[in-house]
């Protein structure tokens, strides 16, 4: 299959090839807690989002700053709201970075996102 270069699914190809075979080896490990066999995998998207604000001294010029971290907090809440357990779609912000010092309104922030989908349309929705 062309899984590594971006196929939407290789299930049809696997089923077609399986009809010609007596034995099939699947090198995918079983579920860790139950030992259940894998019959499908979620699609994966990994994203890095950069946010730019405006630095300012937190004590003297706070009002002149635009906090990239504050904006990042809003974005994280929004991104997590896209999770839909009924559609088996999960979105996780797993890594965040930002700021340059305790007394500086953060000029930059970055977050890393992991998206998992089971249905093709979910990629478009998210």
Where are these regions (language model features)?
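Acidic/histidine-rich catalytic neighborhood of metal-dependent amide-processing enzymes
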Residues: 1-40
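Metal-dependent amide/peptide-bond hydrolase catalytic core
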Residues: 29-34, 39, 45-126
């Amino acid at each position: 299959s062309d899984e590594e270069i971006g196929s939407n699914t290789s299930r049809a190809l696997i089923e077609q090839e399986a009809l010609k075979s007596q034995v099939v080896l699947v090198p995918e490990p079983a579920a860790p807690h139950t030992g259940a066999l894998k019959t499908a995998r979620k699609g994966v998207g990994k994203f890095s989002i950069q946010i730019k604000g405006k630095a300012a001294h937190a004590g003297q010029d706070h009002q002149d700053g635009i906090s990239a971290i504050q904006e990042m907090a809003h974005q994280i809440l929004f991104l997590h709201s896209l999770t839909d357990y009924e559609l088996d779609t999960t979105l996780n912000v797993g890594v965040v970075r930002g700021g340059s010092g305790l007394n500086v309104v953060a000029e930059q922030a970055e977050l890393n996102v992991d998206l998992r989908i089971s249905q093709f349309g979910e990629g478009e929705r998210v």
